[in-house]
Amino acid sequence: MAELRSNMIKQGIDRAPHRSLLRAAGVKDEDFGKPFIAVCNSYIDIVPGHVHLQEFGKIVKEAIREAGGVPFEFNTIGVDDGIAMGHIGMRYSLPSREIIADSVETVVSAHWFDGMVCIPNCDKITPGMMMAAMRVNIPTVFVSGGPMEAGRTSDGRKISLSSVFEGVGAYQSGKINEEELNELEQFGCPTCGSCSGMFTANSMNCLAEALGIALPGNGTILATSPERREFAKKSAKQLMELIKKDIKPRDIVTEKAIDNAFALDMALGGSTNTVLHTLAIANEAGVEYSLERINEVAERVPHLSKLAPASDVYIEDLHEAGGVTAALNELSKKEGALHLDTMTVTAKTLGENIAGHEVKDYNVIYPIDKPFTEKGGLAVLFGNLAPDGAIIKTGGVQDGITRHEGPAIVFESQEEALEGIINRKVEAGHVVIIRYEGPKGGPGMPEMLAPTSQIVGMGLGPKVALITDGRFSGASRGLSIGHVSPEAAEGGPLAFVENGDHVVVDIEQRILSVDVPEEEWEKRKANWKGFEPKVKTGYLARYSKLVTSANTGGIMKI
């Protein structure tokens, strides 16, 4: 074991004041020779995915003590994307990722911890902590709070939060009545945990296994299961082994490991937000990773599992089918799909972790020789509308649609788009453009779950494409193309589209383009008046000035 970092604050005559303060915090004489462990929690009462994490902190701390460490728990913030949806709150969601990363870095660096257990669960908390782990680069293990159970209606149908969002659109279009909508509301989110489909939170917690920074089971063991508590204990004790062997996050999160994470993402049809977050994590790990490489992964990795919101198969079903290890093991049967030699927090390779974990239900995880589709569940599109790329969750597109073209109908904000959709300005065949909603323009790159849910709920899902420099909830589905880069606020092409322009979305060819004569296009660019920031004070104003477009992960640069 390497010399303890924490000796910086606890050894030597000149550290007597430091030790005095540590004694006031409960440190005993016998503790000063032990590793000091940061327990980075994210317990918060208003977020159902985090409401139970106070208990997890206690479990983890006790396990650390039993394994010979001295735990110190601290908390970071969290935003519930579902509750923040559709109003100013959503503009704080992505920016909260940076606050989380900065706050974890600050506490760990200021106090010279020897190792860290991160306890995240929901959308921005997990990647925020991952970014911080790459920065501080001390032995770290991730223990998510676990997924929520799927809801069930009175007739036994499985539902989730996305069912409730889509229910609003169905009610407004007269497809269901208020009583039916109320039933969705009552049963959509039945327990604590991250929302029950392959949405952003569960996508990131599953990817943590493929990256190698969490033990097998992190992504799929239910929040309500006793197994989740045992998992937390096991993870905390494993951290002590990582300290002994001096295995750090940057030893684990390499270019190959990121390939593996995206391979799992492709196989399970994860949220488009995983691209945004994983690029940001790669940046903090010092790994250069391009959008083009993501398409290369998609070309060689098949889509093996179609999960909610694209189907009625939920994370609990994925767990019963063998979980992430089974999905990865099935993928490994195709040559070149995975790098099996990458290191993980088990102190073993990914290949060793997944060996022998066979699929238990091929109706949930398809066989490698009979995949759902031959190509992965995410795609990066390029073209004159997205020179630096745009993302679509192909696994969430209904009816196998691979191409859509039609006239643009342009909205300057999500709120304007929602009003237009509700007032039936959007018709079958349209390409809905929602611009000035990127990281800088939003600001904060708000999610477009409300517009996509309205479109699907009104029966227009397969008939309308939606393109934005904003992003989508993992609960979104349909022809939803987001992360368009450069964003409109930076003078990206999306700023120059006008109503009626002919727009082409071609998933197979990875194309996103608009048919406008060059002379007309240049005229529009010359007449563009630039972007006036929407928020001029507070954190969002600072964020808007420093943040970059989605193709870089939406990171902040000075």
Curated annotation (Swiss-Prot):
GO CC aspect terms: cytosol
Active site: S473
Recorded metabolic or biological pathway in which this protein acts: Amino-acid biosynthesis; L-isoleucine biosynthesis; L-isoleucine from 2-oxobutanoate: step 3/4; Amino-acid biosynthesis; L-valine biosynthesis; L-valine from pyruvate: step 3/4
Binding site for [2Fe-2S] cluster: C122, C195
Main EC class the enzyme belongs to: lyase
Cofactor detail note: Binds 1 [2Fe-2S] cluster per subunit. This cluster acts as a Lewis acid cofactor.
Alphabetical UniProt keywords: 2Fe-2S, Amino-acid biosynthesis, Branched-chain amino acid biosynthesis, Iron, Iron-sulfur, Lyase, Magnesium, Metal-binding
Catalyzed chemical reaction(s): (2R)-2,3-dihydroxy-3-methylbutanoate = 3-methyl-2-oxobutanoate + H2O; (2R,3R)-2,3-dihydroxy-3-methylpentanoate = (S)-3-methyl-2-oxopentanoate + H2O
InterPro entries recorded: Dihydro-acid_dehy_C, DihydroxyA_deHydtase, DiOHA_6PGluconate_deHydtase_CS, ILV_EDD_C, ILV_EDD_N, IlvD/EDD_N
Metal-binding among keywords: yes
Keyword Iron (UniProt): yes
Cofactors named for this entry: [2Fe-2S] cluster; Mg(2+)
GO molecular function: 2 iron, 2 sulfur cluster binding; dihydroxy-acid dehydratase activity; magnesium ion binding
Binding-site residues for Mg(2+), renumbered to this chain: D81, D123, K124, E447
EC numbers on record: 4.2.1.9
Assembly notes: Homodimer.
Family: Belongs to the IlvD/Edd family.
Function in brief: Functions in the biosynthesis of branched-chain amino acids. Catalyzes the dehydration of (2R,3R)-2,3-dihydroxy-3-methylpentanoate (2,3-dihydroxy-3-methylvalerate) into 2-oxo-3-methylpentanoate (2-oxo-3-methylvalerate) and of (2R)-2,3-dihydroxy-3-methylbutanoate (2,3-dihydroxyisovalerate) into 2-oxo-3-methylbutanoate (2-oxoisovalerate), the penultimate precursor to L-isoleucine and L-valine, respectively.
The protein's name: Dihydroxy-acid dehydratase
Gene: ilvD
